[in-house]
């Protein structure tokens, strides 16, 4: 991959408005042209963004699959994005960066899907520069079709917490800091001005849990007060997870320590997810990652 163009996608979810603002602000403030790497910008789901909703028919960030239904707006939109900006598209891009916000207290983080060498290289570069935690989402058959998987290399930049359809200048500034320096960091790496770290620290997806529900499928317990806003912090056996209306607590029962992410993400209620569990892993950064990224 001779890296020439990076696709920056905002508004993949229409009610995540801070990334769109950040890109508009970037284009006004940062007019320096990089001769080596060009940014291409696109709003992923413009109709949902216009209406202020997450999606029209289906989640766009689950729509990059082989299943084709032209009656679904997001399927058509996914096809358009790949046909225009995909590796074999009319305006091909080598890398896709998908910008998202979350109502969960995730801070500024990276989401990876699978273990592609190119993705590891880019994630290592960003973690080394900004100290970002990485959520490696893999082996979840219930959740597939993510946007960045349609490109040879791609990551999600996830920032929170912020409410849906609410502008937060602090969140916007975090996007600006990373996007404004990304090309410089890639160029420095290519020119041997900086080196990748020896290790990459990731939180590997283990599964997700739903809210407790009654026999009719209604939620009958909420996330425990001690668990709210505690993303990335370890949960050990007997730690509280949920509390019902009578004040009874449901605890974590397993022996293995886990680290939760996306605790109480509002958009995930419809997916029956109250939080996801991860385990820590150290990935050795190899020369192969670097070589594949720039090949």
Curated annotation (Swiss-Prot):
Its cofactor is Zn(2+). The keyword Manganese does not apply. Zn(2+) binds at residues 13, 16, 100. Binds 1 zinc ion per subunit. The keyword Mitochondrion does not apply. It comes from the Bacteria. Substrate binds at residues 54, 61-62, 158, 268. One of its GO terms (molecular function) is hydrolase activity, acting on ester bonds. Its EC number is 3.5.1.15. It catalyses: an N-acyl-L-aspartate + H2O = a carboxylate + L-aspartate. GO terms for cellular component: cytosol. Gene3D superfamilies: 2.20.25.160, Zn peptidases. InterPro entries: AspA/AstE_fam, Aspartoacylase, AstE_AspA_cat, Aste_AspA_hybrid_dom. Belongs to the AspA/AstE family. Aspartoacylase subfamily. This is Probable aspartoacylase. It comes from Prochlorococcus marinus subsp. pastoris (strain CCMP1986 / NIES-2087 / MED4). The lineage of its organism: Bacteria, Bacillati, Cyanobacteriota, Cyanophyceae, Synechococcales.
């Amino acid at each position: 991959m001779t890296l020439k163009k990076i696709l920056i996608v905002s508004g993949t979810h229409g009610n995540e408005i801070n990334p769109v603002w950040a890109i508009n602000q970037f284009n006004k403030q940062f007019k320096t042209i990089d001769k080596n790497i060009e940014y291409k910008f696109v709003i992923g789901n413009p109709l949902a963004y216009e209406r202020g909703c997450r999606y029209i028919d289906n989640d766009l960030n689950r729509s990059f699959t082989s299943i084709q239904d032209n009656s679904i707006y997001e399927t058509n939109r996914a096809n358009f994005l790949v046909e225009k900006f995909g590796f074999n598209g009319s305006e091909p891009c080598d890398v896709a960066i998908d910008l998202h916000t979350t109502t969960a207290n995730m801070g500024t983080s990276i989401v990876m899907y699978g273990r592609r060498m190119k993705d590891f290289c880019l994630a290592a570069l960003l973690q080394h520069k900004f100290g970002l935690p990485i959520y490696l989402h893999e082996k979840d058959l219930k959740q597939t079709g993510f946007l960045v998987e349609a490109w040879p290399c791609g990551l999600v930049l996830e920032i929170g917490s912020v409410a849906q359809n609410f502008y937060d200048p602090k969140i916007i500034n975090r996007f600006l800091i990373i996007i404004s320096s990304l090309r410089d960091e890639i160029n420095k790496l290519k020119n041997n001005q900086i080196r990748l770290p020896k290790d990459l620290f990731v939180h590997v997806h283990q599964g997700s849990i739903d809210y407790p529900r009654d026999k009719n499928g209604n939620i009958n317990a909420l996330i425990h007060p001690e668990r709210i806003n505690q993303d990335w912090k370890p949960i050990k056996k007997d730690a509280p997870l949920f509390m019902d209306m009578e004040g009874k607590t449901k605890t974590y029962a397993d022996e293995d320590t886990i680290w939760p992410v996306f605790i109480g993400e509002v958009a995930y209620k419809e997916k029956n997810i109250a939080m996801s569990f991860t385990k820590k892993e150290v990935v050795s950064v190899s020369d192969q990652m670097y070589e594949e990224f720039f090949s």
